[in-house]
Amino acid sequence: MDVVWSATEVRSRRFRPTPVRSDQAELDDHFRWLRRRRIRGYFEVEIPDVESPQLTIGFRGEYAVVHMLAVAPVAQSFVLAGDGSVPNGAYVDLPVRDELARFTGEVVLGVYRAWDLVRAFLQTGRTAELGDWHAL
C-alpha cells in the first residue's frame, strides 16, 4: 500500500514539505536513516486517495509527539496522549517542522512507540485505536 509523506531531509536537516508517494518500506527506511544519524526529525504522513486525517510525528533523542490534523467534517488538530516515558510535570522540546516546541510529559511518547502507532495508522486508516487524543 502506498503512503504520502513529507519529512526532514538527511543532508540539510530541514523539513522538506514536498510530498513523496511511496510504499511504507521507503518511509520506514527514511525514519531509520534519520534515527541512525541521531538527527531530530519531523514527518507528515497520510493515506492517499482516502478521506483520512494526516498524522505528524516530531522526534528528538528518545522522545516523540504525535499530532492528528483532521479536515472533515471540520478542521481540527489533536495531540496524542503520552505513554509515561516522561513524567507529567516534566517537559521535552521536540520538533514541529523545523522549530522546537515544548511539550509536557502528558503528550510525549517513546520514539519507537510513537513510530509504531504511526505505522498502525497507515495500515488501518483508523486513529481511535492509537490512544487518547486531546483537542488543541
Regions inferred by a protein language model and the residue ranges of each:
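Amphipathic, interaction-prone secondary-structure segments
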Residues: R36-V74
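Acidic, proline/glycine-rich low-complexity IDRs
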Residues: M1-R35, H67-L136
